[in-house]
Amino acid sequence: MSTMTLSESNESKKIASLNKLFEGKQNVFYINDNFTIYDTAFYICRGGLPLSLVDDKNKALKITKNYCSTLFNFENSKNQKFKNKKPELFKIILKIYARNISTEARRKTILNDVCEHEDRTMDPDTFDSYIEALNDLYIIKDIKAWNPNFRSKTTIVSAPTRHFVDPSIATYVLGISPADLLNDPNTLKLLFEDFVVKELRTYLQLLDGEIRHYRDGNGLECDIDLHLAHGKYSLIEV
């Protein structure tokens, strides 16, 4: 499950074809002449919910915010994974997750930050049950590490990169707007990477591929690896 891409919402120039790029049939050179940094920040905060695709940008942001505020209204859920789960604890975990978006933050690091925020201890199994529920709810979706040579002696960092299904959820739990992102370039960069991952993940489904990341012990790294079933891959630095 994924939210709409800019192509699906007709907000993309649709100049490049991922399939043609893999086949080596397309060279893309594009000069941006009418797309601003604010537009990027807006799309990150609005997300790809169909209901939010309205002309009024303030209204669009409000629709997304209202949707995100209802994510944990499952008091009457019959699913055992969600029973007895505290909505406020979900929000705290998500906030810590959002602070570590597009990074390889360790599970233990996130758990420790949650405990510090709550000024309490939290059983690791309980923490894992909340993370599992967030995955089941299609709220978070990490990227696994890629190893191009399974027999190589090079040490591959195996930690996943932390990502959301849609970056708008991260901006919601952090309480930030497009204007806030313009004043915080570092956060904008990390959320933009998450946005790119969201878009590419959807396009890659049509090619029967998967998205990974790469970093080895020598410091070589790549934000995104698009890996197809027949062995072709593309390395992307955001």
Give the ranges of each region predicted by the language model.
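Accessory nucleic acid-recognition modules appended to NTPase machines
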Residues: 53-232
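Active-site ExK catalytic segment of metal-dependent nucleases
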Residues: 232-238
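Active-site donor-binding loop signature of nucleotide-sugar glycosyltransferases
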Residues: 3, 167, 238
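Glycine-centered loop/turn positions within well-structured domains
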Residues: 7, 50-51, 234
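Hydrophobic residues at beta-strand termini and immediately following loops
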Residues: 1-2, 214, 236
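Amphipathic alpha-helical "lid/sensor" segments that cap RecA-like P-loop NTPase cores
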Residues: 23-70
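Residue-level signal for inorganic ion chemistry
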Residues: 9, 47, 223
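Conserved small helical "lid"/interfacial subdomain of P-loop NTPases
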Residues: 2-23
